[in-house]
UniProtKB/Swiss-Prot annotation:
Belongs to the protein kinase superfamily. CMGC Ser/Thr protein kinase family. CDC2/CDKX subfamily. This is Serine/threonine-protein kinase ICK. Residues 296-306 have a biased composition (Basic and acidic residues). Residues 292-376, 455-483, 581-629 are annotated as: Disordered. Its EC number is 2.7.11.1. Signal peptide: none annotated. PANTHER family: MITOGEN-ACTIVATED PROTEIN KINASE. Its main location: cytoplasm. GO terms for cellular component: ciliary basal body; ciliary base; ciliary tip; cilium; cytosol; nucleus. It catalyses: L-seryl-[protein] + ATP = O-phospho-L-seryl-[protein] + ADP + H(+); L-threonyl-[protein] + ATP = O-phospho-L-threonyl-[protein] + ADP + H(+). Transmembrane segments: none annotated. CDD domains: STKc_MAK_like. The modification Phosphothreonine is found at T157.
């Protein structure tokens, strides 16, 4: 020890203390670990696990044991000096680590751990204090005092590792554990590096199990039968907890990090990945092209594809969010090339990109820069036919120009990305056809509501809208059912005053449709009234596409109009009005309803007293529908 000088004490542990020293010959800083117990022979020293393991382990991410010195029955280990440990690095942080730094730290830990496990050892005491650092750029595993050989025989001691990083099989006093306990500790350390707080800070072993259950949820007996055997052996009752989403606990972690963390923290040690398997997770795959494959790299895949046949058709799962704009990928936007579409019509399972998949189907043809489905003549009719069956309508031929996008998922603003392309003529034709179809659909819907056309004839719209409208007609609300009931059993229906043979004339005194807003009616009822006014004006002799003539009395005069609650009186059947040309307009009185009518004076009936003013908001049904005599 006369070749080294001690500077200060760095720390004190269970089995020894660590001093900072310097080599007199080279001036290099070193860490001197002085064991507390005395050793009286070299054979006794060489039997130490730390010496046995570190003699065989030489790796960039494992702290290097430079020398072993026994002097005056005291044993000294000379290690390379590292500035700090991971616990100190976490404690000194006042903000979260960037994910690139965390990925670098975890990669080095798993690299060193894979080397340890490969050489037949497992650490048994992984924690941030035993991971020595030179900043976040360099991390090394240290303190192999509890390390054991994997091939050594159990039983092992059940108090190994610090409680917060102890695997559940060790917490349940298992004596038959192995290297997966190191993988569990790595998962706990990874979560702590992300959040700067321990994931399972239990005050005792049982409290630590409770903390684990609160995060991961109570394991099922089928998921980990050995754990239930261990718990029953120590009379431990599992707390009933539901799992928490790790993304909510660690919001700054990416989805790849959550995937790795979830697998590292599996209850069953057999389901945890090994350290070498964890290094192959997507979390550590950096710099690989996302969705962009060169021609050279695509050749072997194409040959394999030709031998094995085309990939199977996989039905896409419905997206959780609104479907993204599909096939708006344009060569002028290279930044979007790495993002696959979330709602594609024919996704295939695999690592090849969408462009290469289409090139396989096209038997080696070069893929187009955009809209790959334009050149796909074989798949296009089949997929379009299936889409037409799903949507229940026949698409215009010009719609095929945009390939495999269903009409139901295409919004009106989805063509914004195509402004710079020369598709204006076909777009104009499609807009005209769509407007015409929409106007026809609107007219058919109004005619079916007004009973000018049977409901089965509404077939030009989509099947969904037809079903929805028929469902609304078949299952009316309670309010509309009441109206239909009373209107069906009364002789007084809205729209006509039979005393003077009067029908409202929209050309003169009929109020505009927007005046219904003052009466509290919805926009739908006002639109219906405006349509009624149009059809009424048709009856006065103007030309109409619906083909109504002057002598035709439409059936909407016998039904309710929108949500209007007013009533009218029918003319006697013996003397019908000669025509609509002799009808006069009804001028609504201020403060009275629009379709106000006067009672018919019939000889032989007692004259009706004036109706009392109803309470505001209520309908006086007794005055509106008196009993028949």
């Amino acid at each position: 020890m006369n070749r080294y000088t001690t500077i200060k004490q760095l720390g004190d542990g269970t089995y020894g203390s660590v001093l900072l020293g310097r080599s007199i010959e080279s001036g290099e800083l070193i860490a001197i670990k002085k064991m507390k117990r005395k050793f009286y022979s070299w054979e006794e020293c060489m039997n130490l696990r730390e010496v046995k393991s570190l003699k065989k382990l030489n790796h960039a991410n494992i702290v290097k044991l430079k020398e072993v010195i026994r002097e005056n029955d005291h044993l000294y280990f000379i290690f390379e000096y590292m500035k700090e440990n991971l616990y100190q690095l976490i404690k000194e942080r006042n903000k979260l680590f960037p994910e690139s730094a965390i990925r670098n730290i975890m990669y080095q830990i798993l690299q060193g751990l894979a080397f340890i496990h490969k050489h037949g050892f497992f650490h048994r005491d992984l924690k941030p204090e035993n991971l020595l650092c030179m900043g976040p750029e360099l991390v090394k595993i240290a303190d192999f005092g509890l390390a054991r050989e994997i091939r050594s025989r159990p039983p092992y001691t059940d108090y190994v590792s610090t409680r917060w990083y102890r695997a559940p099989e060790v917490l349940l006093r298992s004596t038959n554990y192995s290297s997966p306990i190191d993988i569990w500790a790595v998962g706990c350390i990874m979560a702590e590096v992300y959040t700067l707080r321990p994931l399972f800070p239990g005050a005792s072993e049982i409290d630590t199990i409770f903390k684990i259950c609160q995060v991961l949820g109570t394991p099922k007996k089928t998921d980990w039968p050995e754990g239930y055997q261990l718990s029953s052996a120590m009379n431990f009752l599992w707390p009933q907890c539901i799992p928490n989403n790790l993304k909510t606990l660690i919001p700054n972690a990416s989805s790849e990090a959550i995937q790795l963390l979830r697998d590292l923290l599996q209850w069953d040690p057999k389901k945890r990945p090994t350290a070498s398997q964890a290094l192959r997770y997507p979390y550590f795959q950096i710099g690989h092209p996302l969705g962009i494959i060169s021609k050279d790299s695509g050749k072997p895949q194409r040959e394999v594809q030709d031998k094995t046949g085309p990939p199977p058709y996989i039905k896409p799962a419905p997206p959780a969010q609104a479907p993204a704009k599909a096939y708006t990928l344009i060569s002028s936007r290279p930044s979007q090339a790495s993002q696959p579409p979330q709602h594609s019509v024919h996704p295939y399972k695999g690592d090849v990109s969408r462009t290469e998949q289409l090139s396989h189907v096209q038997e080696g043809k070069p893929s187009p820069p955009f809209f790959p489905s334009l050149h796909n003549k074989n798949l296009q009719p089949k997929i379009l036919a299936s889409l037409e069956q799903k949507n229940g309508e026949i698409k215009p031929k010009s719609r095929r120009r945009w390939g495999l996008i269903s009409r139901s998922t295409k919004g009106s603003d989805d063509w914004a990305d195509l402004d710079d392309l020369d598709f204006s003529p076909s777009l104009t034709r499609i807009d005209v056809k769509n407007k015409k179809r929409q106007s026809d659909d609107t007219l058919c819907r109004f005619e079916s509501v007004l009973d000018l056309k049977p409901s089965e004839s509404v077939g030009t719209g989509t099947t969904v809208s037809t079903q929805a409208s028929s469902q609304r007609r078949d299952t009316p609300t309670l309010q509309s059912s009441a109206k239909q009931h009373y209107l069906k059993h009364s002789r007084y229906l809205p729209g006509i005053n039979i005393r003077n043979g009067v029908l409202p004339n929209p050309g003169k005194d009929f109020l505009p449709s927007n005046s219904w807003s003052s009466s509290g009616l919805s926009g739908k009822s006002s639109g219906t009234v405006s349509v009624v006014s149009k059809i009424t004006s048709v009856g006065s002799g103007s030309a109409s596409s619906s083909g109504l003539t002057g002598s035709y009395i439409p059936s909407f005069l016998k039904k309710e109009i929108g949500s209007v609650m007013q009533r009218v009186q029918l003319a006697p059947l013996a003397a019908p009005p000669p025509g609509y040309s002799s009808l006069k307009a009804v001028r609504p009185h201020p403060g009275r309803p629009f379709f106000h009518t006067q009672p018919r004076s019939t000889p032989g009936l007692i004259p009706r007293p004036p109706a009392a003013q109803p309470v505001h908001g209520r309908i006086d049904w007794s005055s509106k529908y008196p009993s028949r005599r």
